[in-house]
Amino acid sequence: MKKLALTDFYNYTFLSGLTFSPDKSKALLMTKKCDKENNGYKSNLWLFTPADKKVKPLTSAGDVGNFTWLNDEEIIFTAMRDPALKNKVAAGETWTSVYKLALGGGEAEEYFRLPEIVTGIKVLDDENFVLTISNNSNRPDIESMEGDEKAKALAKQKADKDYEVVDELPFWGNGMGFTNGKRSEIHLFNKNEGKLKPVSVYPLSSRVADVKDGKILYIVSDFVKGLAARKNSLWLYDIEKGENEKLVAKDKWAIRNAGFTGVDKIFVQATDNAKHGMNENALIYLLEDGEMTPWCSDDISWGSSVGSDCRLGGGKSLYSCEHGVAFITTERFNSVINTLTLAGKREILPMKNGSVDCFDKGGDGVLYFIGMRDNKLQELYSYKNGVEEKLTSFNDAVYEDVSTVVPDYFTYENDGVELDGWVLKPVDFDENKKYPAIFDIHGGPKTVFGDVIYHEMQVWANMGYFVFFTNPRGGDGRGNEFADIRGRYGKEDYSDLMKFTDVVLEKYPQIDKEKVGVTGGSYGGFMTNWIIGHTDRFAAAASQRSISNWVSMAYISDIGYYFAEDQVASTPWTDMNLMWEQSPLKYADKVVTPTLFIHSDEDYRCPIAEGWQMFSALKYHGIESRLCMFKGENHELSRGGKPLHRQRRLDEITDWFEKYLKN
């Protein structure tokens, strides 16, 4: 059996978007695979039928974007296939092309096209749709122009790319570029007429929450004096009447989600952020006579926070029906499905360890989910009466002739709090030998490590490293009190990480204490920066997409103007000392650890200036350091970056540790 190689991720199949047909007899799912030749990903649709438990491919071109069911026998999806339309887009025009494919056979045919950026489609019937459109108020309607007028407008647009003018905050977004003046709008679209009818438009930014019985439920975010508001409102649009109704005003609630349930009820997931700040877990309410009535008062960690570098794409995390809702939550270090009846009875379904990445319910009453089980890559599973069944084998071949390591799990205690930790032993582990080790720290901080596969960790274990990781305080899955470390970054979280390191070194004497490295991304990068300024116990560090200075991060990051103030409980004008005390840059003069910095030039979440500052400070103080910048990548480099860039990133980190932990 050969060892898992760094480049083996090119063979992985990533699954997402599980969606059942209107009659619940069959489901769509998307697969994505690395396209090394074009340095991208090929995305295709597959059909799953519960009756025979089989999947079959529906597309092969690898260009599928958004997709949905048109009816029980036809699907629609976005793709760019017409060469003439591609040329228009290349010249600067904005178009979306939607294709229709019959399940009975035949080629996909263009169903309609629009001179807009369509980011979401909800089907009302074969002719009418609810579209979510990305609109730029600063851009003229070039697509409606002709002749010289269009040519001049395109030429001006090209020339204007040399400049960027902003008058809003945030003015850019990670993975989106500059967002100034851009809004997400909701429109009705009639295919035969080719006309759009606005539901919610500029200056508001709106997203569809649910559509049912001729009504659109949607969430609206506003800008006040050029600043994006942190609270939002909930609206209901009656398609037949063409009327909007405000259901929840914008002055109190941060609304995370909403939908229809039961026969005629509306639920809202929301929080006022009063007690635990912006990361406070939402409560779920029923909206009755204009009042928010608690439906379930449990402290729920909504969705899956179980991290991995082996996913691409999302999917449904909540399912609603006449009996209530089912939804994904993070429980300690696993994500599982819950049910909630209209009477308010919540049940956490007993499931295997791992992650539920998205799910839907079939007509047979069975729950189907895409998830990770048994330290392996994603597959499709069914769940009924407490029993899970694996239904697909997209990634089985990956494990046929390569070695992977199942981590040891254990708990430890710090400050009276029980915490979770894992250790991967090196492949071909010999208890009589000494090995180097790598400590990997998760991002967030409100996420978790769990019993799921991480490609980078498996690579290192196959190269002869111990790899260890834990969930310190500040993470998800254990309620608001556990997650709330506002104003105390680098305190109990750092204490937990150092205690875990002590425990690991004691439990595994085969680890060479002089050859231990530390790495992490985002919050994990922040903690890496923090650690090297507070201890010399690590022989090397790799800080990825990090934060080094809360003062600069606060007013450069796309979320900084509210995230920094909330998380470090200060601003430069209210308590500069507290902000600086929690900034790793303050302690850069104490660093002795050779450190690699990994950063993307389009990372607007933890901007590249954060990496520049820490790198420059270490160089100034004579510490061995290296900065590798990735052009055209953003905060998602390790999980969704271009394949060749993902390979180079892991090469850089691995080579750094090889240099300092082995040589």
Question: Which residues make up each language-model segment?
Answer:
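Blade-terminus and WD-like Trp-Asp/Gly-His loop motifs, strongest in beta-propeller folds
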Residues: 19-26, 66-74, 121-127, 209-215, ...
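Cap/lid segment of the alpha/beta-hydrolase catalytic domain
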Residues: 394-514, 521
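A flexible loop/linker signature enriched in serine peptidases of the S9 family
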Residues: 31-44, 59-65, 79-97, 114-117, ...
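Glycine-rich His-Gly loop
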Residues: 32, 221, 440-444, 600
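Beta-strand-rich domains and repeat architectures in extracellular enzymes and scaffolds
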Residues: 7-43, 207-209
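Non-catalytic accessory segments flanking enzyme active sites
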Residues: 16-19, 159-167, 172-185, 207-208, ...
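Multi-bladed beta-propeller domains
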Residues: 1-15, 47-65, 89-94, 101-118, ...
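Active-site-proximal cap/loop segments of hydrolase catalytic domains
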Residues: 472-663
